[in-house]
Structure formats: C-alpha cells, structure tokens
C-alpha cells in the first residue's frame, strides 16, 4: 500500500484572521473606477485608499490606529482633477505617497505625522510627462527618490523626484499597447512588465533594453500580471484559453516553458500577486473575489506549492499589503492585508500558529528597512544594491517624519507659465477656502456636541 508523502513546511498551517469590527475603517466610499490596481496602500504609519470624490480625484489617508467609523467630512488628498488610479507609499519615507491619475499627472504628497486636519490640495511636486492617464506608480526599492510611472500612452517614465525630472523613458517601441503591470526587482536593477500585446518582458531600464521576453505566458485574452520572486524567477497570473485563472512560475533565463503552471478556477477577476521575499510566499488576491490564496516558492521541483486559502463572505474591491516592518511579530503575524469592501476597509492578519510568544527567528529573518541603499545619482550612474536590512527582534518603531527635499525650480517654472491674476482671488481659490471653512465648522460643531454630552454626564453624577 503506497503512502502519500506530505511536504514539510513551517507555513503549512498559516491562517487568515479578519480584524474585529472596532479595528476596521467603517463608512469609507471606495472608488467605483474600473482599473486593476489595489486601490489601497499601507505602511507602519498610515492607511490610504482611493475613494469616490465629486469634481476630481481624491484619496483618503488615515493614521493606522485611527480605526472605527470615518467621518463623512474627513479631509482628503484632493489635488487631482480626474479619478486617481494608483497610489504607493515611498519605502524610504513613511510620510510620502505618490498618486497616478486619469488627469495624466503623477503627484507626490507629504502627510504630517498626525494625519490631515484640512484637505490637502497642494502636492510637494507634480510630475508631468504622460499624454494619457497614469495607471501605475511604483517606487524604486533601494534608491532614494526614484519613482516609476506607467501610462495608457504605453510609456514608462522613471523620475528623480528630488528634481522633478523624467530621467529615463521607455517609449511605445518597447510596449506597443497598454501596460498592465510593472514590478521592480529586489535590488532595482530590472523591471518586469506585462502588456496587452500578450508579452511579459524583463527590462534593464537604464539601458532601455529588453533582456528577456515571453510571448503568451497565458493563452487567454484577459490581463496578465507579473512580479519578480526569488532567485531570478518571475510569477505570472492570467487566464487560459478556456478562461480558467492560472498562476505560473518562470525562470527568466529559460522562458520557453514554465517551471510550474497551475489552474485555479473560472472566476473573472484579475489576480493581483503580492510576494514576500522573507518567507518566499506569494499571495493571490482577485478583485471581486472573496478569498486570498497563498503559495510557497522553493528552489526544487515542483517549485510552486499551494498552502491554503483564506475565504470570507464579502467580495473585495481592492487590497493593500503591509510591509514586513509594520507587522506584530509577537503574534507570529507574517503578512497583513487591508481588504476593501464597498464601504469598509478590513485588516486581515496572516499568522503562523506557535505556542511560544517569544520572537520566532525562523519566521523573521532580517528584512528591508526604511533607509535607502543608494542615491538617485548613484543608481542612474549604474550602481545596484539590495535593501538595507533590519532585525525585527525588538519590534519596529516608525521614525518621525523626514522632510522630502525637492528642487522646486522645475515645478515653479510650470506654475509661473500660467499665473493667476493678482488682486482678486480666482473663483477656484474662493471655493476651496469656503470648503475649508465648512469643514472647520463641522469639526467645531462635533467638538461642541462632545463637550455638551460630557457636561451632561458630569451634571448627572
């Protein structure tokens, strides 16, 4: 009688645990825009999500601990003139976030430590260079102030945020159609992209050369997403010819055949992959799904091992993924997602069950810290470096806000090109000031109501 051998893995029993109601963000208006990005970005200080807004594009930023019901008059980041499609926190400054929008611009914002008390309309810098909507923004993982944007003009621009200049351009000759996804390698030397022309490319952005390319990694017509994983491999999600969802693992040096190809189900939502290099686990989250699947990647065949699936009743409209330094290591939490419902953002902790509450060194190797390994000039000059690692043994405390230094010469020149008439303020300026006054009045009224209730309580005693 043959006996089935079960592969040993410390992650075999990882389980997902949704947060209690008082630890969720309630009454948020998640964007209805159709676009395959996560719509949510988190770091150890803040949770940000793209929300519905009248008269332009906006997103909400809240301090991570400010859970519960979100006031309808909460101040928003609202400088874009059309819907926001993607947001990304800077990995080297937890107070800086980038946004890409249908208004063809990328904006970089600085959030104060306590969060916003008034609507934020003026970015630190506006990056203009795309001719169609900007659907992807991604920070360089190890070089300071280097930001990538991809637009529906089929162009990828790499920006030096410190100067506001587009320092690298990958034009339509590289991607002849819509770019579905872009991901940096761990050291930032390469990017991998997926495109509507059904090709996945590995590109050296400083040279503008395609170093590897795979035509039709999935036979279906729906969007493919690709991310770098460990040891020179990439993972793709897509659809078969029969519209079955698939996940595949590839060696970038031998793209003829996948190392592993697995069919999952027949749902229609595009799968967004999130890879954790510390544990070699990849999580697949589908927009419109109510589940998160997770797989472990190993260096030996069959390479891609299904671990389990977290399921819930309500479908997800988007998903945020917390960097490792924002997790609770004393609870053996190895990942945390922020699931967007229609009117709620719900944290979901992925946990390894352990009996001891001591620090589990095998679960938490040194991880990427908040300090950049290179300057923008060093990276543009040809240097590469992996992330500077930190230990989580004593926990992680986010540093106080660091000022984002920007040479405003370029941005100021643009603004001077379209000056406002002096003297009487413009109607746009007046309407903004009126809205600020209304928001302040609403805040004062709520504080007064709280004072009245406290006085009644004291008098009753």
From Swiss-Prot:
Residues 403-418 have a biased composition (Basic and acidic residues). Expressed in spleen, lymph nodes, thymus, brain and at very lower levels in lung. Also expressed in cells of the lymphoid/myeloid lineage. Not expressed in Kuffper cells. Residues 403-434 are annotated as: Disordered. PROSITE patterns: WD_REPEATS_1 (PS00678), WD_REPEATS_2 (PS50082), WD_REPEATS_REGION (PS50294). Residues 421-430 have a biased composition (Polar residues). One of its GO terms (cellular component) is cell-cell junction. One of its GO terms (biological process) is early endosome to recycling endosome transport. It holds the Pfam family WD40. The modification N-acetylserine is found at residue 2. The modification Phosphoserine is found at residues 2, 412, 422. The modification Phosphothreonine is found at residue 418. Transmembrane segments: none annotated. WD repeats lie at residues 13-63, 73-110, 123-160, 164-204, 207-251, 258-296, 302-349. InterPro entries: Coronin, DUF1899, Trimer_CC, WD40/YVTN_repeat-like_dom_sf, WD40_repeat_CS, WD40_repeat_dom_sf, WD40_rpt. Residues 424-461 form a coiled coil. Keywords: Acetylation, Actin-binding, Coiled coil, Cytoplasm, Cytoplasmic vesicle, Cytoskeleton, Membrane, Phosphoprotein, Repeat, Ubl conjugation, WD repeat. SUPFAM superfamilies: WD40 repeat-like. Belongs to the WD repeat coronin family. PANTHER family: CORONIN (PTHR10856), CORONIN-1A (PTHR10856:SF18). Binds actin. May be a crucial component of the cytoskeleton of highly motile cells, functioning both in the invagination of large pieces of plasma membrane, as well as in forming protrusions of the plasma membrane involved in cell locomotion. In mycobacteria-infected cells, its retention on the phagosomal membrane prevents fusion between phagosomes and lysosomes. This is Coronin-1A.
């Amino acid at each position: 009688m043959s006996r089935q051998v079960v592969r040993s893995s410390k992650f075999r029993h990882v389980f997902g645990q949704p947060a209690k109601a008082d630890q969720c963000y309630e009454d948020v208006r998640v964007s209805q825009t159709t676009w395959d990005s996560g719509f949510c970005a988190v770091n150890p200080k803040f949770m940000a999500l793209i929300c519905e807004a009248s008269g332009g594009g906006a997103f909400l930023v809240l301090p991570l601990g400010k859970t519960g019901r979100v006031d309808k008059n909460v101040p928003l980041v609202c400088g874009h003139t059309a819907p926001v499609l993607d947001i990304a926190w800077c990995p080297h400054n937890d107070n800086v976030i980038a946004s890409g929008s249908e208004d063809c611009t990328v904006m970089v914002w600085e959030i104060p430590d306590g969060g916003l008390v008034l609507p934020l309309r003026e970015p630190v810098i506006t990056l203009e260079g795309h001719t169609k909507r900007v659907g992807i923004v991604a920070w360089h993982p190890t070089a300071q102030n280097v930001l990538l944007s991809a637009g529906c003009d089929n162009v990828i621009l790499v920006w030096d945020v410190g100067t506001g200049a587009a320092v690298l351009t990958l034009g339509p000759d590289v991607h002849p159609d819509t770019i579905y996804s872009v991901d940096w390698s761990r050291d930032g030397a390469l990017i991998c992209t997926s495109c509507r022309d059904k090709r996945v490319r590995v590109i050296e952005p400083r040279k503008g050369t395609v170093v590897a390319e795979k035509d039709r990694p999935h036979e279906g017509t729906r969007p493919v997403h690709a991310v770098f994983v460990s040891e020179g491999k990439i993972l793709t999600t897509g659809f078969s010819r029969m519209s079955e969802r698939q996940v595949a693992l590839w060696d970038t040096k031998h793209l003829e055949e996948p190392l592993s190809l697995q069919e999952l189900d027949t749902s229609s939502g595009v799968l967004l992959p999130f890879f954790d290099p510390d544990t070699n686990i990849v999580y697949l989250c589908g927009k419109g799904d109510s589940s998160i699947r997770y797989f472990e990647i190993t260096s030996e065949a069959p390479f891609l091992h299904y671990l389990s699936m977290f399921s819930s009743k309500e479908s997800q409209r988007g998903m945020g993924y917390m960097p490792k330094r924002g997790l609770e290591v004393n609870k053996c939490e190895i990942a945390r997602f922020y699931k967007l419902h229609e009117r709620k953002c719900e944290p979901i902790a992925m946990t390894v069950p352990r009996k001891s509450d001591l620090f589990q060194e095998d679960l938490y190797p040194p991880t990427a810290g908040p300090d950049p390994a290179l300057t923008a000039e060093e990276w543009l000059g040809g240097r590469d470096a992996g992330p500077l690692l930190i230990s989580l043994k004593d926990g992680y405390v986010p540093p106080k806000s660091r000022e984002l230094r920007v040479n405003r010469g370029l941005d100021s020149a643009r603004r001077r090109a379209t000056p406002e008439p002096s003297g009487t303020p413009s109607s746009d300026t007046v309407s903004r000031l009126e809205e600020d006054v209304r928001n302040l009045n609403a805040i004062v009224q709520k504080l007064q109501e709280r004072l009245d209730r406290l006085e009644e309580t004291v008098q009753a005693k």
